[in-house]
Structures are given as C-alpha cells and as structure tokens.
Amino acid sequence: MDFTLDQKHEMARDLFKQFAETEVKPLAQETDETEVFPAETVAKMGKYGFMGIPVPKEYGGQGCDPLTYVMCVEELSKVCGTTGVIVSAHTSLCIDPIMTFGTEEQKKKYVPDLASGKKIGAFGLTEPGAGTDAQGCQTKAVLDGDEWVLNGSKCFITNGKVADVYIIIAITSITEDKRGRKKKNFSAFIVDKGTPGFSFGTKEKKMGIRGSSTYELIFEDARIPKDALLGKEGRGFPIAMHTLDGGRIGIAAQALGIAEGALERTIEYTKERKQFGRSIAQQQNTQFKLADMATRIDAAKYLVYAAAMKKAEFAKNPKVSYSVDAAKAKLFAAETAMAVTTECVQLRSEEHTSELQSPVPIS
C-alpha cells in the first residue's frame, strides 16, 4: 500500500493545521474548563468545508477521500480532542449512513445542511444496558398508520443536545425461529430535533473532551414520519455495524492526533527544562522515551491511514471490507494515545499538575 501523500493531501493538511493552530488551539483550554460546546468554532469549520469533507460535491460537500477526512480529524485533535470528536461523530456516524443507505429524497433533505455545518449530526445506539452488546438495545419503534412511534432511551451520545439530526437504532419486531428462540429485528431511523416526545436527559460529566455535548436521549411516544426509516425495515443492525466501522476510523484519527499533540508539546518542554546543568532532552533516558513514543505514533499512523485508504477502495468496490482494518486502527491508536499521554505526564513531572501546563489535549 502506497502511503505517499500527493500535493492535494499536503495542501489539505496545511489548511487543517493552520486552522487548528489559529482558531482551535487558543480556545481549547477554555472549552475544556467551561464544558461549553464550541459553537463559533464549529460554525467556522462549516464555512471552511470541514463538516462535509468526504461528502460528494453534488450534496454540498468537498468530495474528498477518507484520508483527507482522517487528516482533518487528526490535526484538530492535536490541539483539541473535543473539536476532533465533534467532526468525527457528525461525519462518520450521521452523514455516512445517510449517504450509504438513504433514499435520494433523504440525501437531498439532510446532507447539504449537514455538510455545510448549518446542522449538526449525531448517532444513537448505546443504551444503559447495551454498550458492547449492541443487540441488547431496548428502544422500540412501532408503526402506527403513517408514523413510527419511538419509546426508549440512548446514552453517552456525542453531539447529543447540540445536534439537529439523529440516526437512531430501534427494535421494530421480534420473531421466533423453529426452536422458539426470539430474535430482535432492528431498524434505523432519521429523527429531527424538536420531534414531539423527543427530549434530553442527563448531561454526562467527563474527565476529558468536556466541550463535547454528551447527553442521554429520551423517546416517549415520539412520532416520526413513516419515511424517516433509513434503509430497509429490519436492516438496522447491519446499518449500525457499517456505521461503526467508519466511526472507528474517525476515533482512531482522533486518538492519533491526541498522541501527536502530546508528544509535540512534551518535546518542546524537554528542550526548555534544565536539570543538572543541561536540558532533559539531552539526557539519554529522556531520548529513549521520546523515541519509543514517536515509533508507536508512526505505527499507529500507518494503521489509521491504511484503514482510510481501504475505505476509499470500498467506495469503488462494495465487496472490499475494511472492518478489520478499522478495528485494528482504533485499537492500536487508542492504546497509543493512552501510553503516550501517560509517558508525557511522567516527563513533565510536577508540571502536569497545573492545568495550564497540561501536555495532553484533553479538551
């Protein structure tokens, strides 16, 4: 696989990096401390086209490949984890399933406003009793005439309260096989904010990424049109799994950016920090640690970029699967982010106790 970036990719990265440094980084600390969604920054990203990078131009997007999108999330996350995950959840978990499974009418209705950033997207699968066990979901949708009636709740939803468009997975029927074993049949729906019966519950208090709006979604006899069904009835689980494949690449890019940002800040610090008459960057023990972190980050980057390129192949040939590539990328990039940020805190010694000196882009 060729990892050489062409001129367009390099130019895109420069744009993302410049925006991150000038528009995102100065507000990152405040975003984390106040736990307020960075609405102005998101609006600016919409104007720059960051909210619809992989969306075809005919639907208002930039028409770029998955790798360009990954680089955007990566560069944003170097300075602010919050901003990176906002773009990731919006694009991978809301726009992508509409583009992949939606009707032409649904695409025209929702995608242009999502791609421009005029509207924000979210995805609701996780429930209090259904995390890794996605089939444990209890939220139900019952067809009543020309409307679906939703009842249930979702939790830990990124972009929760600020979103305008939600992809919701719910049970639409339960069937039995010849042995009497029951099977839940799920379907996917597009739900608009403001739908009667749709409200918000608990706002999650988090240790990091605190500017991201993470909320509980509550559905109490929420009625949505019959044509809000995304894809075919009973195909909600495959739709959710496909969506999560793309989501894993986005989160992998976020983790990669966080690790890179932490290492960059720590390298600067080690050059300034003096011990025993010289900077700690000149001490071999420090150099070993920095080298190990840089190596892990490069390995993670190759996995993340490879997954993005595999997703691009899928767009041309649906028989190509990128599920394993996405899972590997998320696993290794997330573990790398944890390992690198932990080591960076150790190198910063007592300095890490000051929020203003944090080496980790936790916002």
Which sequence ranges carry the predicted segments?
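Alpha-helical interface subdomain recognition
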Residues: 1-89, 101-106, 113-118, 131-137, ...
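Flexible, small-/acidic-enriched active-site or ligand-binding loops
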Residues: 136, 194-225
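A short core secondary-structure module
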Residues: 146-147, 151-200
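Long, acidic (Asp/Glu-rich), low-complexity accessory segments flanking structured domains
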Residues: 220-239
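Short Gly/Pro-enriched turn/cap motifs at secondary-structure boundaries
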Residues: 129-132, 156-159, 179-181, 206-213
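A short, Trp-centered hydrophobic/proline-enriched beta-strand micro-motif
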Residues: 117-125, 169
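Single conserved hydrophobic/aromatic residue that forms the stacking wall/gate
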Residues: 352-363
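Glycine-rich phosphate/pyrophosphate-binding beta-alpha loops
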Residues: 81, 155-160, 208-209, 245-250
